[in-house]
Amino acid sequence: MSSAPPGPAAPRLCCMEKGPDGYGFHLHGEKGKPGQYIRLVEAGSPAERSGLRAGDRLLEVDGTNVERESHQQVVERIRAAAGAVRLLVVQPQPEEQPPKTHSDPDGEAQREPPAAETPAAERSGPEERELRPRLCRIKKGPNGYGFNLHSEKSRPGQYVRAVDPDSPAEAAGLRAQDRIVEVNGTSVEGKQHADVVAAIKAGGDETKLLVVGVLADEFFKKCRVVPSEAHLAGPLPEPMANGDVEKENGGEPRLNSVSERPPSPALATSPEGSETHSEPDTQEGDKRSSAPSSLLDLDIPLAVAKERAHQKRTSKRAPQMDWSKKNELFSNL
């Protein structure tokens, strides 16, 4: 005699108090489908200790049914709880389980969280997501990876200039204007164009790129922090406001300014000797550093002062570019 199929699982009430890093779970909603699901429960978190499990479907928040509420409404309910929350959940039947892979309208890789996913209700959804770096794993196709890498004179770094439609790069979530931070786990901050291209090619038929979009790039620069894989899902840094005082390596405090940047060479060249980009800010740095000495020469004749200024400007001027090598600034990969 065959046994009857098991009935639906009983709902469970999970009571948790917010810890220093939040509740410790990720809430996930499918576009066009009702219901909110627990996608991930962090080890050792208040959520794990309360009995919350990945895959649970959320029924109630503090006694209020949320099965028909939108993702953002549920997130706001959890955030409104004063340091503690009670979640009524149920482990769904196998046919109810949400798919484990996702894609969004931007064509981002399955490794990216979907637009309706919020870590422990601590974030504000899409806005916070745009501030995070993205990890794009790309397998080379018949026509290569399908993106164009370039550098600019006006700003340091290597940027994605274009992504071919239906290419491996597009499928992996790479976007135009992305800045390359790491190639195959190695930082390329401050590297020259040719070095970054070589690092990508060294990966053979597959490469792993950590990138930041325009908003994320601006955010991390304000925070004065180099993005890393730790920022894919971990806590984000806090931006530093102008006038904040910071101590470095136990030394004297210094005044932070958003416009300050690490020192960089005025002209970066590839091994072949072609120009990749120049950094105008270093000229400003030269002016600042030379200011004290110029104050000592106030009594020199005006004609001599003009001649010295002209010599300084011409000495800092970058050599003219060999336009026959311009293609080395733009590399199709």
Curated annotation (Swiss-Prot):
Gene Ontology molecular function, alphabetical: chloride channel regulator activity; protein-membrane adaptor activity; signaling receptor binding
Keyword set includes Nucleotide-binding: no
Protein name per UniProt: Na(+)/H(+) exchange regulatory cofactor NHE-RF1
SMART domains: PDZ
Residue span, PDZ domain: 13-93, 135-215
InterPro entries: EBP50_C (IPR015098), NHER (IPR051067), NHERF-1/NHERF-2 (IPR017300), PDZ (IPR001478), PDZ_sf (IPR036034)
Primary residence: membrane
Role of this protein: Scaffold protein that connects plasma membrane proteins with members of the ezrin/moesin/radixin family and thereby helps to link them to the actin cytoskeleton and to regulate their surface expression. Was first known to play a role in the regulation of the activity and subcellular location of SLC9A3. May enhance Wnt signaling.
GO cellular component: apical plasma membrane; cell periphery; cytoplasm; endomembrane system; filopodium; microvillus; microvillus membrane; ruffle
Pfam family, one: PDZ
Gene Ontology biological-process entries: bile acid secretion; glutathione transport; negative regulation of cell motility; negative regulation of phosphatidylinositol 3-kinase/protein kinase B signal transduction; negative regulation of platelet-derived growth factor receptor signaling pathway; protein localization to plasma membrane; regulation of protein kinase activity; renal absorption
Transmembrane spans: none
Organism: Gallus gallus
Xref: CDD domains: PDZ_NHERF-like
Region (Disordered): 90-164, 232-333
Keywords: Cell projection, Membrane, Repeat, Wnt signaling pathway
Annotated S-S bridges: none
Membrane topology summary: Peripheral membrane protein
Entry superkingdom: Eukaryota
Compositional bias segments (type: Low complexity): 112-122
Compartments in which it is found: Endomembrane system; Cell projection, Filopodium; Cell projection, Ruffle; Cell projection, Microvillus
Biased composition (Basic and acidic residues): 97-111, 124-133, 274-289, 323-333
